[in-house]
Amino acid sequence: MIFSYKHLKKLANLNEISFEDVIKAFNLIGFEVEETKEIRHVENIKYGKVLKIYKNENSDNLTVCEIQFKDKIRIIQTTAKNVEINKYVMAFIPGSKLANNLIESKLLKGIISEGMLVGFDEMLGFEIKLVPKELSKNVIVLDEANLNEDPIANLELHDYLIDLAILPNRSDAISYLVMAKELAAFFGTKIDNDLICLKNLRVSKINSNLEGIFVKSKTLELKLYDKYLLLKSHLKLTNTYKDLENLILIHTGMPIHFLNLKSLEKVNIVSKSSSLEIANRTLKIDNNLVIEKSREIIAIPYLETQKEFEIKDSQKEFFIFMNILSPKEVRKTIKTLKLESSQIKQATKTISHGMQLNAIQYMQSLFEEIEIVNINLNLKPKEILFDHTFINRIAGFEIVKEQKFINAKKSLEILGFKFFEDKILVPAYRHDYTGPYDVIEELFRFYGYDNFPILQPEIKPFKIQKKYDFKFSLASKNYNEIKTYSLVAKEDNNFDPFNFKTEILMKTFPSEKRRIIRNSQAFSLLEIAEYNIKRKLEKINFFDFGMINEGKRALIFASNEKSFNEIKKDLFSLFSYKFELRKTKNNYLHPNASAHIFYENKLIGWMGKINPSLKISDLIFVEILLDEFNISKNQFKEYNFDPLKFRDITFSIEKNQSIDTYLKELKKIKNIFEVQIIDKFEKNEKLNITVRILLEDDAIKNLDEAILKNSWN
């Protein structure tokens, strides 16, 4: 969008801020300045009051005007037909410049003309296509003017145009009022006009899906200053109500559509297919959005209006359509009708309800009386969490304690943000906010990316984390990998060695056989084993990695060739941890050939056979939950060439007492390699159990100390 530097400066109260500083500010807060252009097309023009008009008898086209200026009365001739007595004009007097051409007195058809009157074409040097023919032929005539004032200053004819590239998600910033707020936030000034303050407004709910305002206004006119502002934005002047639509658009970013309606009875916006005669053209509408009254199309939103429902310049009551339409539907309308307008182009972007409110507040200053229709004025601001620790982590240093960061928060407060201890309230017009990262980006752009300290990154050599290859190890132990489904039928999910509390039933599933996440991989593996046995492949040594209930990763391996102790050795050789096997009372496992696997008193798996009441099988299983502990490889230790020693210890315990307590204490002693029971006998109502301990020399001392401490035999 093209912005006027002088108009932005006035809105944002930037009295002492130069053009160069404004350009720098735009670039620093994230708006790319694509192009700038200085406007200095005229010099030294003056206001004058028309005292007398008469025809030049020597010419068919020239009219002689006697005009009172601040210093004296001058005679200026013109071909324009709209000059009236007691009206005011602007004129180039001798010594003025038009496009660097010096204006001097000149003899025209026998009468000296002391300058020339100013029209739209002369004023800014814009292309003629922006000005209607009727305006192009005439000069500018004013009802009031102060001869002591300077029209160049009043109309800001010496200005800079700033063409800004604005990101698609910032449709709110395609407006003077929001962009002025951005500058005010950067420079720490305050805008006089509070965009969010909406008071003493009449609000109505009407049986129609149209949103907007009813307007009552004594006059419908556009000031000359505003017309030039539209020309600066490269918007064509057409008629009063179209120019007002564009003026509201460039100030608020809200597309609007004026309609000659005094009520919304039987008026709605609908999708329709039809052939429509409008604006001397035939338009074919193909399921596009239209505004209809009593099922007759009266307008295409933000694009065209039937003549009967257009606003007349003298009209005092009308309706302003302000619906927020689907950008997809708007683009479809443009594609179908191959027509465009500044309003509908803006409607292709995301428009927020906050932008609606900004437009209503701005229109309060334009019209005497407005009535809100079907628009909610009490918008709840979006809340976003505000975590100082998180912001510091993203910044890479303690940014929240910096004065520049505190100033950045104050800048956001000027934009309408409200800060609390743990949250931020985002102004309603900022639809681009979705989470904490958006808040951080906003704070950082006002903190200034140039203010971030330049830190040398700490360079470290790459750490290669080797993944332990269970597959290779299991394959070396004569196991074959299989693949099973994580989903099973509900009736096949009766085996639960881990005692999960709930079942995960899928909302969408390929079939009833694949509906629930299994509690164990055992029955899936068993199903494949039985299939292979039926095919006369009777030697089973399988393993699989998969997911079970609660999303846990598990490893399972099973064999009908190996014994319990052989599979136990396979388990302990896979991991570098001291797992503990405990006798299980789980009804799903074989009571005499199964155990639970614990690590640091935490259940991490099971080993053994399935309870015959569930399934008769000679397979011995091991199933481990891989996420319950950190998997690491065995660490290298220098080899000790000394032969291992063994010690035998006999424990005398009660008949109903378990030997496990003593075995646990023995296994805590470092460099003990093996503890096994070698003998049992009863004597004097006591159970005597002899264990053999295989250990290194340096463990003997620790073992002796433990024997004395615990009074073992």
UniProtKB/Swiss-Prot annotation:
One of its GO terms (biological process) is phenylalanyl-tRNA aminoacylation. Transmembrane segments: none annotated. Its cofactor is Mg(2+). It is found in: Cytoplasm. Keywords: Aminoacyl-tRNA synthetase, ATP-binding, Cytoplasm, Ligase, Magnesium, Metal-binding, Nucleotide-binding, Protein biosynthesis, RNA-binding, tRNA-binding. It catalyses: tRNA(Phe) + L-phenylalanine + ATP = L-phenylalanyl-tRNA(Phe) + AMP + diphosphate + H(+). Pfam families: B3_4, B5, tRNA_bind, tRNA_synthFbeta. Residues 379-454 form the B5 domain. SUPFAM superfamilies: Class II aaRS and biotin synthetases, Nucleic acid-binding proteins, PheT/TilS domain, Putative DNA-binding domain. SMART domains: B3_4, B5. Residues 39-153 form the tRNA-binding domain. Its EC number is 6.1.1.20. GO terms for molecular function: ATP binding; magnesium ion binding; phenylalanine-tRNA ligase activity; tRNA binding. It is an enzyme of class 6 (ligase). InterPro entries: aa-tRNA-synth_II/BPL/LPL, B3/B4_tRNA-bd, DNA-bd_dom_put_sf, NA-bd_OB-fold, Phe-tRNA-ligase_IIc_bsu, Phe-tRNA-ligase_IIc_bsu_bact, Phe-tRNA_synthase-like_B3/B4, PheRS_beta_core. Mg(2+) binds at residues 432, 438, 441-442. Binds 2 magnesium ions per tetramer. One of its GO terms (cellular component) is phenylalanine-tRNA ligase complex. Tetramer of two alpha and two beta subunits. Belongs to the phenylalanyl-tRNA synthetase beta subunit family. Type 1 subfamily. This is Phenylalanine--tRNA ligase beta subunit.
